[in-house]
């Protein structure tokens, strides 16, 4: 037996606002069901779902962390800035990554990085 795929589903307060945020990061809409308040986003082979209906405490900040691994962290970072997101400068970590961290509109933390050995 094997696990074929794992897709995070993040609880959000406002699905359209969250979709717009992730589009600025370079994701595109694969599926969207406004009547469900749900969307599936993709970036290459990676998938992410956002869903209003699974947020049992809409006034409480989220504490999820999703780590994204682009193949070119510098270009991904520049794209996020070009698309109007306020993102911190890239940092080189003690654990060998070049990365930056941001929160989506619902407080879900995104760590976005590339291994220094991968050329970043």
PLM regions with names:
Residues 1-17, 64-66, 115-120:
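N-terminal beta-strand motif that seeds the catalytic metal site of vicinal oxygen chelate
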Residues 9-48:
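Core segments of cupin and vicinal oxygen chelate
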Residues 56, 95, 116-119:
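A short acidic/small-residue loop/turn micro-motif
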Residues 6, 35, 62, 96:
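Exposed loop/turn and edge beta-strand positions of beta-sandwich/beta-sheet ligand-binding modules
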Residues 25, 51, 113-117:
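Membrane-topology and secretion signals of cell-surface/extracellular proteins
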Residues 28-34, 91, 117-120:
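Conserved catalytic-core motifs of GNAT/GCN5-like acyltransferases
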Residues 41-46, 102-105, 115:
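Active-site beta-strand termini and strand-to-loop segments that position acidic
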Residues 13-16, 66-109:
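Vicinal oxygen chelate
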